[in-house]
Every structure is written in C-alpha cells, then in structure tokens.
Amino acid sequence: MQIHGTCDPRFAPVREAFEGNFKDGLEVGASVAVTRDGVPVVDLWAGEAVQGGAPWQRDTIVNVYSTTKTMAAISVLVLADRG
C-alpha cells in the first residue's frame, strides 16, 4: 500500500500506525491530518475511497458520523479544565 502525503519525522509513529492499519487489513482507505501549534505536521492518505473503486485522494470527502460528539465533549472538558 502506498502512503501519500507528508509527515514530520518527529511524528513517524503516527505514519507507522497509519500504515500498519492497512497492512493488518483494518482499512480500505483513510486519511489523517494533525496540526501542532497551527502548523501541519502530519497529512497522510492512502487506499481506496470505495472498496474496489477510485483511489483515496488528499481531498476525498467522507462521512464522519458521530465523531463530532467526541470532539465537542473533549472541547468542553478542555475549556472546563482551563476555567
């Protein structure tokens, strides 16, 4: 599986875990992006947008289902912690 994109060497374990999901058959297609202090440090994508279909692209649009609930909860907890 060819992994596309960029990854700061300090975040090599993120790339390794991302690639490992494909090697273990856990992913058909995926992307991951991480910023640190507003600077992109990981921007990776690989696989297929639909199994047996078009390759995943940097701008492939996906349904994130209920991920917003988790992000909202984490945001509220961080704000509460900061007072």
Per-segment meaning from a language model:
Residues 4-64:
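Short, conserved catalytic-motif segment at the N-terminal edge
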